[in-house]
Design a protein with these regions (language model features):
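Pyridoxal 5′-phosphate
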Residues: 1-386
Length: 386
């Protein structure tokens, strides 16, 4: 129940990858025929991915994952456009790959506006317009939030960016396999994606860069990826990611409809069968696989540990920050107190999740919640006084 953290590799994806581990293991940058077969596989993958998002093949750049893609997009755009301006607009609920990159740039002379969100995690379009300055060079807003699932008004943001001639980047790591994305209709100039979020391999991602966007390299060295991303291609990873992307988009409508039905069933059971819970994130403009609740009078980490003992995987936020004792920056940004933020639990399903599995998980959450609350003096006091 933690598919937002990562997903299982599909068997069809693994089969597609296998030849490039031990049979056709050549370096695609070499000139001999053996290597050119590997290069052809990389280029076929590039063509496939481009077709899924309405892009040209030469606008797809393979990376090591979402964090690298985010870093590349933000840093390279800032460097390339520093003569034009030094102002970047983003939001307070972005992934840390964006936020920490922006903080790095602030230490190096750039100015960053961190937009507030409402209680559902939604960006205010008017606030974006009001934040634009003559020196604004980049807007970076995630397509959908990784913790609370809220889907942002990306098409409207893209229209604003195009109107003001500002580059628009979106982190679509969570959205890519669940929402049809057309980079042209949404006026997206750069987009980050990571393969392991949609049943592809870890260590493979891509950055879409519109041809009109002239940014430099993040990693320097060889001439791979048209001299914009040095390093030997991860051929099995690239091939596997493309196969996973094709499978995800082939069955997207069916899978999404099923996930929404199961998600809403999951949410309904939690809300109807456990007292003092609060759904985090937008109720309808939400990723089809995301469930995030505050369960009051229950410490989130304790809940997760006890669920883990029952073989149930869940999280209290992003897997990238799971070792931190600080409250989720996303939950505090939507107005939760530190105390309430620490009562949160994120569950995320996949197209393989069944109603029977959800029923098992809900029953375990109910048992664990009852047990933890029985040890909580705050819960006892609240119930007695109300």
């Amino acid at each position: 129940m933690d598919n937002a953290a990562t997903t299982a590799l599909k068997p069809q994806v693994f089969e597609k990858m296998k030849p490039y581990f031990m049979e056709n293991y050549a370096n695609p940058s070499a000139v001999y025929g053996f290597a050119q077969q590997a290069k052809a596989a990389v280029e076929d993958a590039r063509d496939s991915i481009a077709g899924l998002i309405g892009a040209r093949a030469n606008e797809i750049y393979f990376t090591g994952g979402g964090s690298e893609s985010d870093n590349w997009a933000i840093k390279a755009a800032a460097i390339a456009l520093k003569e034009k301006g030094n102002h970047i607009i983003t939001s307070k609920i972005e992934h840390h790959a964006i936020l920490h990159t922006c903080q790095f740039l602030e230490k190096n002379g750039f100015e960053v506006t961190y937009l507030d969100v409402d209680s559902d995690g939604m960006i205010d379009i008017e606030q974006i317009k009001e934040s634009i300055r003559p020196t604004t060079i980049l807007i970076s807003i995630m397509y959908a939030n990784n913790e609370i699932g809220t889907i942002e008004p990306v098409m409207q943001i893209g229209q604003i960016a195009r109107e003001y001639n500002i580059i628009f980047h979106t982190d679509a790591v969570q959205a890519f396999a669940h929402i049809p994305i057309d980079v042209n209709k949404c006026n997206i100039d750069m987009m980050s994606v990571s393969g392991h979020k949609f049943h592809g391999p870890k260590g493979a991602g891509f950055l879409y860069i519109r041809n009109s966007v002239k940014i430099g390299a993040l990693i320097h060295g060889g001439a791979q990826e048209r001299a914009r991303r040095a390093g030997t291609h991860n051929v099995p990873g690239i091939v596997g990611m493309a196969q996973a992307a094709m499978l995800a988009h082939k069955d997207m409508q069916k899978n999404t409809e099923n996930e929404i039905r199961l998600r809403d069933y999951f949410i309904s059971r939690i809300e109807n069968e456990i007292d003092y819970v609060k759904l985090n994130g937008h109720r309808s403009k939400r990723l089809p696989n995301n469930i995030n609740f505050c369960i009051k009078f229950v410490e989130g980490e304790s809940l997760l540990i006890m669920l883990d003992q029952k073989g149930i995987c869940a999280s209290s936020g992003s897997a990238c920050t799971s070792g931190s004792l600080d409250p989720s920056h996303v939950l505090t940004a939507i107005g939760l107190t530190d105390e309430d933020a620490h009562t949160s639990v994120r569950l995320s399903i996949s197209e393989d999740t069944t109603k029977e599995e959800i029923d098992i998980v809900v029953e375990e959450i109910k048992k664990v919640t009852k047990r933890l609350r029985s040890m909580s003096p705050l819960y006892e006091e609240y119930v007695n006084n109300n």
